[in-house]
Curated annotation (Swiss-Prot):
Matching CDD domains: EF-G, EFG_III, EFG_mtEFG1_IV, EFG_mtEFG_C, EFG_mtEFG_II
Binding site for GTP: 17-24, 81-85, 135-138
Organism: Helicobacter pylori (strain J99 / ATCC 700824) (Campylobacter pylori J99)
Role, per record: Catalyzes the GTP-dependent ribosomal translocation step during translation elongation. During this step, the ribosome changes from the pre-translocational (PRE) to the post-translocational (POST) state as the newly formed A-site-bound peptidyl-tRNA and P-site-bound deacylated tRNA move to the P and E sites, respectively. Catalyzes the coordinated movement of the two tRNA molecules, the mRNA and conformational changes in the ribosome.
Taxonomic path: Bacteria, Pseudomonadati, Campylobacterota, Epsilonproteobacteria, Campylobacterales
Protein name: Elongation factor G
Length: 692
């Protein structure tokens, strides 16, 4: 079976948006128009199309899949779903890794919101080219040009409209295509399946010419030959303009911008045309960086059908019919179903039972998957999100994804005994799907704790327990994940010796403990020379320290950001053992940390509050009471924006307090930023409470 769509006709795109910008509707409409069996533009009685929509409504094409395949004008588009909430930035980051391009959807009324800024930053970080779709042009207060300004000011981007709206709110009927210089007007009777290409309305001609001029200028800057032609006063032809838009979009010097109303079925086809005209094929993006697991050297993986198979597992979902689905983006080579594949991240072989391609309303079993495609693998047992699957002959690790540690924990209890086992299984499955979510058992109380990136993240997990796994769970008070670290350097020795008849125990170490940069983690350095401690006992010392650092000396929280140097010691021919050196290492570490000026650290959240000016004073006063540090204040659409770092422990219940302080007009978003030192008076309370 040869590949159906050549690599240069594939588009892997994501639709990234703030929660209310209309992402789902846009995705659904894309699937609707690409799935319509007749060619759009043939004359049909609108009824057939209408029925199709109604049926789909009853069955509901909601994109529940992580990646859906559809076709438009001989191109294959793989739509990768990206979540729209800040607690799930890990998901967004991961989908950014496997996308080649993105459509950023903004609401024509709400414009650029805090979440859209986060997603935009992540797309910049991974170098994802994008086009902007201004949605909801039919809403009251819709203003395309406002959004254009906000993108310039807030996202510091360079938007270049390639179509502009005809009308707005309830008079929005279509768009002016600035490349062709024609008006495109949608026909309400056919659910927008049919549209007419007309001359530009006279009252908009001036504006259209003005924006066309901006577009041509932006295009000319992409290419010297075009620039000469433009400066010489010659007209650029349509092909040249399209080529220039694509160049500018791919090198991210500007962002093509379109508008429409997905809900009212206007502007979706023009958006699809822009996706295939301007967003990159897998062959047009930079080669993917990887690491050779044998040599640890950097290697580059080129998107092509030649070469050994290499792909990245980016999402795991549990499907009621086929079990676990592992979604994989294939970067190089091809793979047949039923064959073996090597997981280079885990150093394990896995067998691929089936390969499934997801369409909006059906699944298709395929025999082979090729470079540039996205496909669900069935039958993988050990593969988790972020793992690389490849051919053992040419192994590569595509990504060492850094998954953030949870900043908040909540105890969960099943409501009935019968749910206990079900809950364990369900939490295990959810943890496999989402690496930023952790499950652990609290030793002292035996309670199950779940950890995540914020209150909302955990609320959604508890909600999924109920909906998908039918487990009713009670949740406890949220607990913050504190950490400990040290502020000064100390050297300590510890001799662990038990030698009273029979086989004794003997381990003796000298260590130096030093603080490191915040966020840099733990480092162990071996400076033993002349065999004063035999080689085979060195890892035991390291292991002893790693076990001891899980329980800090202040309040039993994990200790972070320090370096231990093992520089001297002694051993006994008969009585020394790994166990003895492990204990010696762990005791030396505990004694050293007591003397090294230990301090408590807490998660600091980056908080952004948006309020009308009259509540500004109250909100800032409240953030100060919560030990917040105010970083900046801005204006946005007549509202005041306050940016601050606030300790997570002070933020519980903030949404209710903010609502009552601003009569429901204030909104906020927060995400974890860094660990900061807890002031000593508060640290004292926390320590006393822990030791209780």
């Amino acid at each position: 079976m040869a590949r159906k769509t050549p690599l240069n006709r594939i588009r892997n795109i994501g639709i990234a948006a703030h929660i209310d910008a209309g992402k789902t509707t846009t995705s659904e409409r894309i699937l609707f128009y690409t799935g319509v069996s007749h060619k759009i533009g043939e004359v049909h009685d609108g009824a057939a199309t209408m029925d199709w929509m109604e049926q789909e409504k009853e069955r509901g094409i909601t994109i529940t899949s992580a990646a859906t395949t559809c076709f438009w004008k001989d191109h294959q588009i793989n739509l990768i779903d990206t979540p729209g909430h800040v607690d799930f930035t890990i998901e967004v980051e991961r989908s950014m890794r496997v996308l080649d391009g993105a459509v950023s959807v903004f609401c024509s009324v709400g414009g650029v919101q805090p979440q859209s800024e986060t997603v935009w930053r992540q797309a910049n970080k991974y170098g994802v080219p994008r086009i902007v779709f201004v949605n909801k042009m039919d809403r009251i207060g819709a203003n395309f040009y406002n959004v254009e300004n906000q993108i310039k000011q807030r996202l510091k981007a360079n938007p270049v409209p390639i179509n502009i709206p005809i009308g707005a709110e309830d008079t929005f009927i279509g768009v002016i295509d600035l490349v062709q210089m024609k008006a495109i007007v949608w026909n309400n009777e056919t659910m927008g399946a049919k549209y007419d290409v007309e001359e530009i309305p006279s009252d908009l001609l001036e504006k259209a010419k003005q924006y066309r001029e901006k577009l041509v200028e932006a295009v000319a800057e992409q290419d010297e030959a075009l620039m000469e032609k433009y400066l010489g006063g010659e007209e650029l032809d349509i092909e040249e303009i399209k080529k220039g838009i694509k160049t500018g979009c791919l090198n991210m010097s500007f962002v093509p911008m379109l508008c429409g109303s997905s809900f009212k079925n206007k502007g979706v086809q023009t958006l699809l045309d822009a996706v295939i005209d301007y967003l990159p094929a897998p062959t047009e993006v930079v080669d993917i960086k990887g690491i050779d697991p044998k040599t640890e050297e950097e290697v580059f993986v080129k998107s092509s059908d030649d070469g050994e198979f290499a792909g990245l597992a980016f999402k795991i979902m549990t499907d009621p019919f086929v079990g676990q689905l592992t979604f994989v983006r294939v970067y190089r080579g091809k793979l047949e179903s039923g064959s073996y594949v090597y997981n280079s991240t885990k150093d394990k072989k896995e067998r691929v039972g089936r390969l499934l391609k997801m369409h909006s309303n059906k699944r298709e079993d395929i025999k082979e998957v090729y470079a540039g495609e996205i496909c669900a693998f069935v039958g993988l047992k050990d593969t988790l999100t972020g793992d690389t699957l490849c051919d053992e002959k040419n192994a590569v690790v595509l990504e060492r994804m850094e998954f953030p540690e949870p900043v908040i924990h909540i105890a969960v209890e099943p409501k009935t005994k019968a749910d206990q086992e079900k809950m364990g299984v369900a939490l295990g499955k959810l943890a496999e799907e989402d690496p930023s979510f952790r499950v652990m058992t609290q030793e002292e109380t035996g309670q199950t704790l779940i950890g995540g990136m914020g209150e909302l993240h955990l609320e959604i997990i508890v909600d999924r327990l109920k909906r998908e796994f039918k487990v009713e769970a009670e949740i406890g008070q949220p607990q913050v994940a504190f950490r400990e670290t040290i502020r000064s350097s100390v050297s300590k020795e510890h001799k662990y010796a038990k030698q009273s008849g029979g086989r004794g125990q003997y381990g003796h170490v000298f260590i130096k403990l030093e603080p490191k940069e915040p966020g840099s983690g733990y480092e162990f350095v071996n400076e033993i020379s002349g065999g004063v401690i035999p080689k085979e006992y060195i890892p035991a010392v390291d292991k002893g320290i790693q076990e001891a650092m899980q329980n800090g000396v202040l309040a039993g929280y994990p200790v972070v950001d320090f370096k231990v140097t093992l520089y001297d010691g002694s051993y006994h021919d008969v009585d020394s053992s790994e166990m003895a050196f492990k204990i010696a290492g762990s005791m030396a570490f505990k004694e050293a940390s007591r003397a090294a000026n230990p301090v408590l650290l807490e998660p600091m959240m980056k908080v952004e509050v948006e309020v009308p000016e009259e509540y500004m004073g109250d909100v800032i006063g409240d953030l100060n009471r919560r030990r917040g540090q105010i970083n900046s204040m801005d204006d946005r659409l007549g509202l005041k924006i306050v940016n601050a770092f606030v300790p997570l422990v002070e933020m519980f219940g903030y949404s209710t307090d903010l609502r009552s302080a601003t009569q429901g007009r204030g909104t906020y978003s927060m995400e974890f930023d860094h660990y900061g030192e807890v002031p000593s008076n508060i640290a004292k309370e926390i320590v006393e409470k822990r030791k209780g």
